[in-house]
Curated annotation (Swiss-Prot):
Species of provenance: Escherichia coli (strain K12)
Protein name, entry field: Inner membrane protein YrbG
Classification of source organism: Bacteria, Pseudomonadati, Pseudomonadota, Gammaproteobacteria, Enterobacterales
Gene behind the chain: yrbG
Sequence intervals crossing the membrane: 6-26, 38-58, 68-88, 105-125, 127-147, 170-190, 199-219, 244-264, 270-290, 303-323
InterPro entries per the UniProt record, alphabetical: K/Na/Ca-exchanger, NaCa_Exmemb, NCX_ion-bd_dom_sf
NCBIfam families hit by this protein: calcium/sodium antiporter (TIGR00367), PRK10734.1 (NF008005)
């Protein structure tokens, strides 16, 4: 059990590291081939924070462990808001200024509702996967359009912050070096995560869904946590919140879409009856906090969000032995 725990932690750290290096390499390649920096920032870099979830979901799907993938998608969205936004608010109260974010928030809520329509029947079908991946393409086109508009106007706070985060150094040799390293590490790391998560789920008599919701989702959300904390400390509030919005959309359309496309079939009914409702509720709370014009969320909100995370985690593990055979 201790060995499986250690290997799971090492695997998650390697997944996060390899995803970061892949994004770094992709940013250099895009810059080299003349893609505007703002589009790189709003697509490659933003999506990069969700790459660990995507990698784990893909590996779990290939091993027909769809509940682990579904749990990772839902759990990451819950954790991004309750834990990561809560901790960021505790570090420093902040306000969302960007009009781009306010245009993306309704899309995040819409996609969250779509997730319910996919999960409610306890089945993931290949048509569900195709539909979700089609939404992913539409979303990418949407943010590219937003990037081009922001580039012309040049006044949006989010776009200024994203440009500041782009890598400034490195040529093609550096990009290909990190690309190769990332592609070598990724399959090994994801296999470590999936295999040892299964071992621990069996040892503690909890479902793969619960393991995905908690341990895997927390581990794969480390990039969002690092981005949010660093963002609010530097006063880059919009990029901290923007990464959460982008990650939550991406988790539904890609991380949930992959198991539906690769390994369609039955899923744990608790994914809809227990976990989806929590995800939708915290998504609505998140949107309301961002739409407010007064300084928000403050430390009081941070305490409530992190407290909500602890309560959710405790109830999840308390109920799991009763609800899971």
């Amino acid at each position: 059990m201790l060995l499986a725990t250690a290997l799971l932690i090492v695997g998650l750290l390697l997944v996060v590291y390899s995803a970061d290096r892949l994004v770094f390499a992709a940013s250099i390649l895009c810059r080299t081939f003349g893609i505007p920096p703002l589009i790189i920032g709003m697509t490659v870099v933003s999506i990069g924070t969700s790459l660990p979830e995507v990698i784990v979901s893909l590996a779990a799907s290939l091993h027909e462990q769809r509940d682990l993938a579904v749990g990772t998608a839902l759990g990451s969205n819950i954790i991004n808001i309750l834990l990561i936004l809560g901790l960021a608010a505790l570090v420093r109260p902040f306000t969302v200024h960007s009009d781009v974010l306010r245009r993306e928030l309704p899309l995040m809520l819409l996609v969250s509702v779509v997730a319910g329509s996919v999960l409610y029947d306890g089945q993931l079908s290949r048509s569900d996967g195709i539909f979700l991946l089609f939404l992913a393409v539409l979303w990418l086109l949407f943010i590219v359009k937003l990037a081009r508009q922001a580039e012309r106007q040049g006044t949006d706070s989010l776009t200024r912050e994203q440009l500041a985060e782009l890598p400034r150094d490195g040529g093609l040799p550096v990009a290909f070096l990190w690309l190769g390293i990332a592609l070598i590490i990724m399959p090994v790391a994801t296999r470590m995560v999936v295999d040892n998560a299964t071992v621990l789920a069996n040892y503690f008599a909890i479902s793969e869904l619960t393991m995905g919701l908690t341990a895997i989702a927390i581990g794969t959300s480390l990039p969002e946590l690092a981005t949010a904390i660093a963002g609010v400390r530097k006063g880059e509030n919009d990029i901290a919140v923007g990464n959460i919005i982008g990650a939550n959309i991406f988790n539904i359309v890609i991380v949930l879409g992959l198991p539906a496309l690769i390994t369609p079939g039955e899923i744990d009914p608790l994914a809809y009856s227990r976990d989806y409702s929590v995800m939708l509720l915290v998504s609505i709370i998140f949107a309301l906090l961002c739409w407010r014009r007064s300084p928000q969320p403050g430390r009081g909100v941070g305490v409530l969000l992190t407290g909500g995370f602890i309560v959710w985690l405790a109830m999840l593990y308390w109920l799991s032995p009763i609800l899971v055979e």
